[in-house]
């Protein structure tokens, strides 16, 4: 089986450890983990720098895996990554990671599905950030993009399910 080139979207502060666990599974070939120092350097340069970093790292990736933690849906840059991926025609899928343990061995609460925040115009395939379709020509992104919610509470079982 050929490994996919993927871009991982996640809330860095809350879920970087969990994202590392998913990356280490080896099921897919993804981008190299960004260090907190690198991310802080990009953030310091402002919004345009962040957008360029995301756009560059998403290039040549065939899909985006949104690792859904407790606050992913509320994060500006996670939402930007979802919109950008859709506009670029990349596959988009979500995996709930709240039951994987973080670096301190703690699990989190389940977050909202970030795909619920977007609608797609069925005629033009245009993505817009709002929760409810404006008319019959729009569909909620959550009806298109699949999410995987491991049915386990024990972190090792969640890890095995994702694997």
Regions found by a protein language model. Name each.
Residues 9, 66-69, 95-96:
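Conserved beta-strand segments of the P-loop GTPase G domain that flank and frequently precede/overlap
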Residues 1-7, 18, 103-163:
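C-terminal interaction surface of TIR/SEFIR-family domains
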Residues 95-103:
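Short beta-alpha junction loops
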Residues 88-92:
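A short helix->loop->beta-strand "cap" motif at the edges of active sites that frequently abuts
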Residues 71-87, 104:
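Conserved TIR/SEFIR loop-to-helix hotspot centered on a Trp-containing motif
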């Amino acid at each position: 089986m050929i490994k996919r080139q993927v871009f991982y979207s996640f809330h860095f502060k809350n879920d970087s450890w969990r994202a590392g666990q998913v990356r280490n599974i080896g099921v897919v070939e993804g981008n190299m983990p960004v260090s907190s120092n690198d991310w802080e350097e990009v953030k310091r340069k402002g919004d345009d720098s962040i957008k360029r970093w995301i756009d560059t790292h998403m290039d040549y990736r065939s899909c985006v895996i949104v690792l859904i933690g407790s606050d992913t849906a509320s994060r500006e840059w996670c939402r930007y990554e979802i919109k950008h991926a859709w506009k670029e025609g990349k596959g988009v899928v979500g995996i709930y990671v709240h039951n994987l343990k973080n670096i301190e061995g703690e699990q989190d609460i389940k977050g909202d599905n970030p795909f619920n925040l977007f609608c797609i115009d069925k005629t033009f395939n245009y993505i817009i950030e709002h929760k409810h379709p404006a008319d019959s020509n729009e569909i909620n992104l959550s009806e298109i993009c699949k999410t995987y919610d491991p049915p386990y509470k024990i972190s090792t079982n969640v890890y095995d399910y994702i694997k």
